[in-house]
Curated annotation (Swiss-Prot):
Membership in a protein family: Belongs to the glutaminase family.
Disulphide bonds in the chain: none
Protein name: Glutaminase
Highest taxon in the source lineage: Bacteria
Residues engaged in binding substrate: S64, N114, E160, N167, Y191, Y243, V261
EC number: 3.5.1.2
Single GO molecular function: glutaminase activity
Catalytic EC class: hydrolase
Subunit record text: Homotetramer.
Organism of derivation: Rhodopseudomonas palustris (strain BisB18)
Reaction catalysis annotation: L-glutamine + H2O = L-glutamate + NH4(+)
Protein's UniProt keywords contain Hydrolase: yes
InterPro entries, sorted: Beta-lactam/transpept-like, Glutaminase
Length: 309
């Protein structure tokens, strides 16, 4: 076993012994059914070595982690023109807040809060039918992982559509300012479905490898984005990837990351590793509580914080 294998196993054992697991996302009925005892951790280093602990192959709803990949696709489609429709600043507000949109003329603060991700989804949808846009997103996820089995959890998507009134309000408000080009129902349908993609920690860590290695998958040699674009996506992940808990994550973990209310976290150690953690219990900001604890321990023990050891 490598040092990384040992560290990952130790962390998985430590997390299993803890009782402070946070609370699952009750406002999405399907997510409220998830057992809060689950935990997985997978790290894939630059050589392609996989260190796995806990429920590494248990699929979960990636939720807002999908926003990293839709951001990548939207930037590929219209480039830096995207930043005319969505900002790059932390919000300091809950992920589904409508308050800032009123003051900022319908322009969302960043692509990782719900309003921003809906605007990004609208870019991907333009020129397509909703089914085609979803197909593009799924093909991208399957390309990144080399796994054709990745799919949308239709029960979760339907659950979100039935209860996503706040997201509908955000979308309609942006539409009133001309930020969205497509019918609101179409954009929301694609948004709810890509948030309902189900992946395991192993699959998610595979998907994030291009961000850890200057836009390129080192195992396949495939270039996904330019080095500069990978760096900028990582920068937005660091400053905005955990809603109004982004500063706390940067302080404790010191890595770019993106959380989802399904309990997953994708973290990037630039030049070193792509990391996925999952624990469905959330903290007050809607981020995985023990996922953050595990990543803090990993970053500290491996000396991976971008701010130094």
């Amino acid at each position: 076993m490598t040092e990384l294998d040992v560290v990952v196993q130790e962390i998985a054992e430590e997390i299993a012994a803890r009782s402070d697991r946070g609370s699952v996302a009750h406002y999405i009925p399907e997510l409220a059914k998830v057992d809060p005892a689950g935990f997985g951790l997978v790290v894939i280093d630059a050589d392609g070595h996989v260190a796995a602990g806990g429920d590494a192959d248990t699929a979960f709803s990636i939720q807002s982690i999908s926003k990293v990949f839709t951001l990548t696709l939207a930037l590929g489609k219209i480039g830096d023109r995207l930043w005319q429709r969505v900002g790059r600043e932390p919000s300091g507000s809950p992920f589904n807040s409508i308050v800032q949109l009123e003051f900022e003329r319908g322009i969302p603060r960043n692509p990782f809060i719900n309003a921003g991700a809906i605007a990004v989804t609208d870019v991907i949808l333009s020129g397509h039918q909703p089914r085609e846009a979803l197909g593009e997103i799924l093909r991208f996820m399957r390309f990144l992982t080399g796994d054709p089995t990745i799919a949308i959890d239709q029960a979760v998507a339907a659950s979100e559509q039935r209860t996503g009134f706040r997201n509908a309000a955000l979308a309609n408000y942006m539409k009133s300012f001309g930020v969205l080009d497509n019918p609101v129902d179409y954009t929301l349908g694609v948004y709810f479905h890509h948030c309902a993609i189900a992946m395991s920690c192993r699959q998610l860590a595979l998907a994030g490898r291009y961000l850890a290695h200057s836009g390129r998958n080192p195992s396949t040699g495939h270039s996904v984005v330019s080095p500069g674009r990978a760096r900028r996506i990582n920068a937005v992940m660091l400053t905005c990837g955990h809603y109004d808990g982004s500063g706390e994550f940067a302080y404790r973990v010191g890595l770019p990351g993106k959380s989802g209310v399904g309990g997953g976290v994708l973290a990037i150690a630039p030049g070193k590793a792509s990391i996925a953690a999952w624990s469905p219990g959330l903290d007050a900001s809607g981020n995985s509580h023990l996922g953050r604890v595990a990543l803090e321990a990993l970053s500290k023990r491996m000396g991976w914080s971008i701010f130094g050891v």
